[in-house]
Amino acid sequence: MGGHTIGIVMNGVTGRMGLNQHLVRSIVAIRAQGGVAMPDGTRLMPDPILVGRDERKLRALAEQYGIQRWSTDLEKALSNDADPIYFDATLTQVRAANVRRAIEHGKHIYCEKPLSVNTEEALDLARLADQAGVKHGVVQDKLFLPGIRKLKRLVDSGFFGRILSVRGEFGYWVFEGDWQTAQRPSWNYRSEDGGGIIADMFCHWRYVLDHTFGEVTAVQCIAATHIPERVDERGRRYTATADDAAYGTFKLAGPEGDIIAQFNSSWAVRVYRDELLSIQVDGTEGSAVAGLRGCKTQHRVNTPRPTWNPDIENPFDFFADWQDVPDNGEFDNAFKYQWEMFLRHVAIGTPYIYDFYEGAKGVQLAELGLKSWAEQRWLDVPALPRVGALQPA
């Protein structure tokens, strides 16, 4: 079984997501399995060059994971025609400039979300990439989580009947950084550095809602900075200027009428649910609750008939009336799964719909969420133009 390699300039792999999910659990894992399986039976082997500012960290990562190349010179790395793909997991504030440079060098581009700090800039990047004839994609990992894939299977099968509502609960307690180390970087809590839970999570909720239930057509949001002061990585106290919790309501254009979705996102909540993310869907024929990996259902024929009576002990075990959705297959790491899709897209032109225009939709919803919070009102979510956009291969 033959194969060939494909070079990837990986910028930002010393950060939490860039390292754990993109380098270790995606690219290193793909290399360990012998490359990406192609339709003709060959294998496509990624050959990364690690790029960043910290020479010591880059060298250590390269040695640890058996990677031959690393550099602190992004321009030099982009100038190498042997590496046709550029990947960006740097800070949101600098991503657009990096992506523009990669486009100028003719690179195909895959990057973390959010694509940029505002919708106009995100659309501009999409148009520039199309004009340059390069392929482009944005990470939309939650679509490929086992729990969400099971939920999509239920939607496609018609299990729910007419979908009425979607309820999402996401978050966990992120320690302040004093008596226990924070699980997230300090820039997440500084709006001037691109932080904030709306900017982070509304990008996720946009693609999950759009691709699973229906296009988002309106948004209402209220947010808060519940923890006003935190401690950074160097032990210094700082003022949190970004929102750490957001409570959003969305109207979706479902196939059989509007669907109401509510998502609570918080880094200041203690978990009392099976997983860090829980999504409940209620329909006329049945309901489901999905997490990161699991999914449970309750059909109308299995729905109990409770009545309100606070004067007696609850006679129902409501959790017992739900059934697990079987795997019916194997689920790989969500980031790795999408990486393999994008690599095939670049190599042989297989379809890939999660492009910069899809990424711009996430930025748009985050912007409108922030505006809704500031103006304390509902806002329509208009369709974004795909001016000059190429059709998916």
Which ranges hold each PLM region?
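Glycine- and charged-residue-rich phosphate/anionic-cofactor binding loop of Rossmann-like
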Residues: 41, 46, 345-362
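C-terminal capping/lid region of NAD(P)-dependent oxidoreductase domains
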Residues: 3, 134, 161-165, 371-393
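Predominantly a Rossmann-like dinucleotide-binding segment in NAD(P)-dependent oxidoreductases
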Residues: 142-240, 376
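Contiguous beta-strand/loop segments that form the cofactor/metal-binding neighborhood of enzyme cores
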Residues: 201, 206-302, 336-352, 367-369, ...
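N-terminal Rossmann-like dinucleotide-binding module
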Residues: 1-65
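Beta-strand-loop-alpha-helix segment that lines the small-molecule cofactor/substrate pocket
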Residues: 84-85, 91, 96-143, 158
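Active-site loop of classical SDR/Rossmann-like NAD(P)-dependent oxidoreductases
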Residues: 53, 328-339
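Short acidic low-complexity segments
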Residues: 69-81
